Amino acid sequence: MINYVYGEQLYQEFVSFRDLFLKKAVARAQHVDAASDGRPVRPVVVLPFKETDSIQAEIDKWTLMARELEQYPDLNIPKTILYPVPNILRGVRKVTTYQTEAVNSVNMTAGRIIHLIDKDIRIQKSAGINEHSAKYIENLEATKELMKQYPEDEKFRMRVHGFSETMLRVHYISSSPNYNDGKSVSYHVPLCGVFICDETLRDGIIINGEFEKAKFSLYDSIEPIICDRWPQAKIYRLADIENVKKQIAITREEKKVKSAASVTRSRKTKKGQPVNDNPESAQ
């Protein structure tokens, strides 16, 4: 029998531990982000080597408590409260921070979207119609008609834009398992932040507020649905997303085949062997 009284006590203990851990990390951080409500989040902390064992012990405690709390499903604890667990990056030579666009995604069915639109339309009409609300309702009705073209269980992805988050460009030392031939490795800083052990941090940390846009997104090739009900969101049909993913995979595979054929052709040319660019003609 599951002891939910103990589970609730454990959860309260975890929340207190987590809040204090994050508060101390923010207080000593070289960089923090601000959440939409003003809370400091994503602390980036350069950690003296002599403190790594004590911080790792606290991280291990976080991990154990989070895993134990998963045994109490009826408490309905959001996974975002328990995870991710903070991390210590080791074997780092140099770190540069930069900003990138953050996107929150949520999946909804066409039926759910229509329900929320209908609810908002009723609220707007009950408050009285003016020029602004009339245009707003008109936009909602247009989106509703679009959604009615699909089955109620047709799935859509709503991607909310409009805020940024911190990324790291990490250079590891050559003996690190994460070494990337001298090239940097991107690291997404979660809300709980990250620690960077200073033992090998010869070239230090560079705090860069520069904003970098992703070079390519599969969503670039899909026409989004825009609805005033969600002004900072773009809505995409999941089936369209999957189709683009498949096309990207096909294109990538075709490039591999062409590249392999090009290498083979080059090798044969060097050896003085004849090259047949149309294998079917040999049949």
From Swiss-Prot:
Under the heading InterPro entries, the entry gives: Lysogenic_reg_DNA-binding, Repressor_C1
Gene Ontology MF: a single term? DNA binding
Which UniProt keywords are present, listed alphabetically? Answer: DNA-binding, Repressor, Transcription, Transcription regulation
| DNA-binding region range list | 30-49
Return the annotated region ranges for Disordered: 254-283
Taxonomic superkingdom: Viruses
Function comment: Sequence-specific DNA-binding protein required for the establishment and maintenance of lysogeny.
Could you tell me what this protein is called? Answer: Repressor protein C1
Task: Give the organism the record lists.
Answer: Enterobacteria phage P7 (Bacteriophage P7)
